[in-house]
């Protein structure tokens, strides 16, 4: 989910859709373009994507990032993007694509769930709220839009897990927008605070070790029930991490914890 600037809204590629506006699309084995969209991708991974994928593959978050992700700080950016690493061959195929389809379909990333749409978020600073932007943007080779099934952006999410992906990706987008301005000062985006922030949102297993095996709980008073949940539940720990990063970098307080 990308941040959308008010000034360049009309320049965004694709067809902008209202939440209840219709589009036609279908995808299935046997369609002539099947799996072509799984090649040569800049496929962004969001924090919840990493949680689902590392659990699906039975590895730690750090191991998943090392094996399957590229961490890229773009020029002028203040927080790195995490992208799924494609296979190192001419086709650049997704490592989880098979002739039958996606090998990790139940845990596929949010971007894949939204395809052929792209979602953006526009932040209204005066009102303190965000607005969803929907863009219908299938690639030129895609035959999906020529099929008969009709959808709306609001009805496109059909998998039972889509709501969890949607909610956590939006929460991440609302945090990520704060990084439009430099929070690092002299430390820069490779300094200690930057490494801590990245750990809290992307390397969830290392963050759990930090919370429970350092002086963290001596320095912060955390709700007792939440502490128990965070020991085992990745999602509770991730949402705590979002709030902790806001406090660490911008002093935004949370009801979940306070300094002792």
Describe the predicted segments one by one.
Residues 1-36, 42-45, 49-260:
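Short loop/turn segments that flank or connect secondary-structure elements
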């Amino acid at each position: 989910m990308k941040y959308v600037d008010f000034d360049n809204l009309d320049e965004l590629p694709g067809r902008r859709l209202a939440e209840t506006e219709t589009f036609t699309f279908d995808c299935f084995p046997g369609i002539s373009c099947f799996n072509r969209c799984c090649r040569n991708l800049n496929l962004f991974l969001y924090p919840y994507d990493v949680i689902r994928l590392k659990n699906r593959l039975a590895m730690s978050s750090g191991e998943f990032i090392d094996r399957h992700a590229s961490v890229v700080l773009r020029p002028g950016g203040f927080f790195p993007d995490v992208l799924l690493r494609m296979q190192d061959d001419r086709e650049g195929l997704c490592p989880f694509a098979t002739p039958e389809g996606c090998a990790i379909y139940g845990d596929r990333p949010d971007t894949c769930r939204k395809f052929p749409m792209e979602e953006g978020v526009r932040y209204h600073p005066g009102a303190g709220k965000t607005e969803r932007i929907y863009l219908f943007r299938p690639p030129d080779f895609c035959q999906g839009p020529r099929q008969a099934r009709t959808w709306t952006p609001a009805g496109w999410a059909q998998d039972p897990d889509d709501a969890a992906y949607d909610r956590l990706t939006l929460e991440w987008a609302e945090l990520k927008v704060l990084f439009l301005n430099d929070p690092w000062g002299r430390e820069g985006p490779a300094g200690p605070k930057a490494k801590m922030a990245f750990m809290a949102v992307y390397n969830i297993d290392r963050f759990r070790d930090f919370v429970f095996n350092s002086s963290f709980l001596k320095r912060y008073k955390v709700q007792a029930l939440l502490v128990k949940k965070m020991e085992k539940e990745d999602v509770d720990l991730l949402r705590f991490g979002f709030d902790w990063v806001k406090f660490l970098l911008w002093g935004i307080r949370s009801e979940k914890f306070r300094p002792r």
